[in-house]
Amino acid sequence: MKKTIFQQLFLSVCALTVALPCSAQSPETSGKEFTLEQLMPGGKEFYNFYPEYVVGLQWMGDNYVFIEGDDLVFNKANGKSAQTTRFSAADLNALMPEGCKFQTTDAFPSFRTLDAGRGQVVLFTQRGLVGFDMLARKVTYLFDTNEETASLDFSPVGDRVAYVRNHNLYIARGGKLGEGMSRAIAVTIDGAETLVYGQAVHQREFGIEKGTFWSPKGSCLAFYRMDQSMVKPTPIVDYHPLEAESKPLYYPMAGTPSHHVTVGIYHLATGKTVYLQTGEPKEKFLTNLSWSPDENILYVAEVNRAQNECKVNAYDAETGRFVRTLFVETDKHYVEPLHPLTFLPGSNNQFIWQSRRDGWNHLYLYDTTGRLIRQVTKGEWEVTNFAGFDPKGTRLYFESTEASPLERHFYCIDIKGGKTKDLTPESGMHRTQLSPDGSAIIDIFQSPTVPRKVTVTNIGKGSYTLLEAKNPDTGYAMPEIRTGTIMAADGQTPLYYKLTMPLHFDPAKKYPVIVYVYGGPHAQLVTKTWRSSVGGWDIYMAQKGYAVFTVDSRGSANRGAAFEQVIHRRLGQTEMADQMCGVDFLKSQSWVDADRIGVHGWSYGGFMTTNLMLTHGDVFKVGVAGGPVIDWNRYEIMYGERYFDAPQENPEGYDAANLLKRAGDLKGRLMLIHGAIDPVVVWQHSLLFLDACVKARTYPDYYVYPSHEHNVMGPDRVHLYETITRYFTDHL
């Protein structure tokens, strides 16, 4: 196949690629071998080999709570030891009204603490929701629920819940058993398939995870209203009924009309709803809604359709009128606000804003006139989670990649700026929860050699270890896991990789290698977590004599804007160049059988897998592409146009990434897998690729999961990976 100029350039760079010194986890070659039922989520024995964890661990004021056996455990965080109060399912049953007993008393129900009341929890039972006051030890209210109830959102004080049923939005107040939902207020009444209230919008991009937003005191509820009538529906077919049923999916594809979103505010005291006067154009993205502490203003980060401009606007909550634009952010590639405003404790006019304006995600202090007071954090690293403030509101707490892109540590910094202080210096991945008053943290820690360690730290006063998980792999054979860096195709950017070696590795032998690929934004596959972030299937294939290699190419997450945005308007090109540098590294290893290299990936990784098989069929013998994007014209607007621009603006980029036009280039064995009811990468993608292959006289293999969406989850995931395993063992 004729090489493009771009391919010739990156191949010459990759020829000079050498791996920098790597580290390795020593293998344990003696012991039993794993099964897929033990290694894959959904497997019958998966949780026997999953590092032990603390169930339901979360803060309740300055106390932390979790489930242990059939007890809810309530501990005071004092930095030294656990002061434990226990409350069992049997104790709870004794307090429940007649007719609301749990069907079993051998386990405490799942729960969540509420933002305000320090002793308030909501219990999720088989009959509905139970409000429970831990301190007073009494049931405070009940909500009946059913399978039609969705998108539950509790008010800050926990006495009301917003929910969606049949596309309409309701607010219910807890009452006696059987009265909860029947006493609900209908906030909207005209909901339909094409007019949806209270749900996440814009395909859940821009950090949008829900569609309702309570004001701080619970007196108002902001909500999304999404008109989809201008979007042409895509059919999703359920084949289980005797006569198959088609349901419309309102999926706005790149370059086509988008849905129109507005924001309403319901005032509980008056029963009145006002809509924000967001004006024209209607095709824009209303993201990251946040309330002022006094409930008078609702702030919205508004992104234009081109996604190169973000305006942070203020609206009057009483009238819906536009008040002011606080500031505007622009970027020649794209903007992507992911976080709402976070106000300083006790302040109604100063807040923290997260932005990548200097090339890295950092924290900025603003006032509500739009004046930038200062940039608080700085450096060539990313803030990955802003946790909150200390009790005085003078210090900020956050997680970041400052120590390494492979790690997350918990830091504090004075709000006036200065040096950061690492409060979790142990090398690895720290996932933290800051207590509501900012005085303590729960630190859930993993490293390549630490399965899980849970520590409760009273900041500045001491720590208490709640859990040190044992190695769940003891007694089983484990392959060697190597990690290190290679150079990207630009010759100057280091890329992190992980390499799972074949079990019982003999350097004198030759082994096949499978490249597991994703490569796109918002994903990082190589981290310093348990087993060096190696997945169960990698270990399973190592048992069968395969090596599995993964490299986070440019375009992937947590390495800054320039690292990610290099793919803009040309998806699949830079990522593929970097993946081929990884292949060159593999070929430089004496033990690699260069004639037996395979590739596997899902979603964006499915696109990459198919692309690699079509472009480098002389290198990759076998590929398995799951849920693949085949033609970006048929992907949704929010993600697709962010990274590609609209098809009308970038026809060359869309054309270069359109794999339908290259079906005739298939040389090796390629199996495509798709969920028949996939709402993310619609089934149309792989079906049309099959049709293109028929016309081109090429012969991929194909597997469909009729009952699954974008990912095959639950027990069927074991079946999925047995299918993938058989394909590689048969053909590679």
UniProtKB/Swiss-Prot annotation:
<dbReference type="GO" id="GO:0004177">
    <property type="term" value="F:aminopeptidase activity"/>
</dbReference>
<comment type="function">
    <text>Serine proteinase. Releases tripeptides from the free amino terminus of proteins. Has a requirement for Pro in the P1 position, but is inactivated by Pro in the P1' position.</text>
</comment>
<protein>
    <recommendedName>
        <fullName>Prolyl tripeptidyl peptidase</fullName>
        <ecNumber>3.4.14.12</ecNumber>
    </recommendedName>
</protein>
<feature type="signal peptide">
    <location>
        <begin position="1"/>
        <end position="24"/>
    </location>
</feature>
<feature type="active site" description="Charge relay system">
    <location>
        <position position="678"/>
    </location>
</feature>
<keyword id="KW-0732">Signal</keyword>
<dbReference type="GO" id="GO:0008236">
    <property type="term" value="F:serine-type peptidase activity"/>
</dbReference>
<dbReference type="GO" id="GO:0008239">
    <property type="term" value="F:dipeptidyl-peptidase activity"/>
</dbReference>
<dbReference type="InterPro" id="IPR002469">
    <property type="entry name" value="Peptidase_S9B_N"/>
</dbReference>
<keyword id="KW-0378">Hydrolase</keyword>
<dbReference type="GO" id="GO:0006508">
    <property type="term" value="P:proteolysis"/>
</dbReference>
<feature type="active site" description="Charge relay system">
    <location>
        <position position="710"/>
    </location>
</feature>
<keyword id="KW-0720">Serine protease</keyword>
<dbReference type="Pfam" id="PF00326">
    <property type="entry name" value="Peptidase_S9"/>
</dbReference>
<dbReference type="Pfam" id="PF00930">
    <property type="entry name" value="DPPIV_N"/>
</dbReference>
<comment type="similarity">
    <text>Belongs to the peptidase S9B family.</text>
</comment>
<dbReference type="InterPro" id="IPR050278">
    <property type="entry name" value="Serine_Prot_S9B/DPPIV"/>
</dbReference>
<keyword id="KW-0645">Protease</keyword>
<dbReference type="InterPro" id="IPR029058">
    <property type="entry name" value="AB_hydrolase_fold"/>
</dbReference>
<dbReference type="InterPro" id="IPR001375">
    <property type="entry name" value="Peptidase_S9_cat"/>
</dbReference>
<keyword id="KW-0031">Aminopeptidase</keyword>
<feature type="active site" description="Charge relay system">
    <location>
        <position position="603"/>
    </location>
</feature>
